[in-house]
Structures are given as structure tokens and as C-alpha cells.
């Protein structure tokens, strides 16, 4: 169990989980509010 916890706390795993969450969040925001990203640039 300690090895699994150490593996899940490594940088590539955390980066993958964070990027997946961020991409999903942006996709959902664009689903409810389309073309909002174009207003900021």
C-alpha cells in the first residue's frame, strides 16, 4: 500500500490528473458558455 501511495504522489501522475481535471473543466465551461474563451484574447 505504501508503494501505491508513493506512486500516486509522483509528479507525472499528479500532472496527468490535474491536466485531465483542467481539460474537463474547460470543456464543461465551453459547453454551457460557448465562445467565452475568445473574449479574453
Curated annotation (Swiss-Prot):
Transmembrane segments: 7-27
A UniProt-annotated Pfam family: PSI_PsaJ
Keyword Chloroplast applies: yes
Disulfide bonds: none
InterPro entries, A to Z: PSI_PsaJ, PSI_PsaJ_sf
GO annotations of cellular component type: chloroplast thylakoid membrane; photosystem I
Location of the protein in the cell: Plastid, Chloroplast thylakoid membrane
GO term, biological process aspect, one: photosynthesis
Signal sequence annotation: none
SUPFAM superfamilies, alphabetized: Subunit IX of photosystem I reaction centre, PsaJ (SSF81544)
Membrane topology: Single-pass membrane protein
Keywords in alphabetical order: Chloroplast, Membrane, Photosynthesis, Photosystem I, Plastid, Thylakoid, Transmembrane, Transmembrane helix
HAMAP family named among the record's database cross-references: PSI_PsaJ
Function recorded in the entry: May help in the organization of the PsaE and PsaF subunits.
Family: Belongs to the PsaJ family.
UniProt name for this protein: Photosystem I reaction center subunit IX
Species of origin: Trieres chinensis (Marine centric diatom)
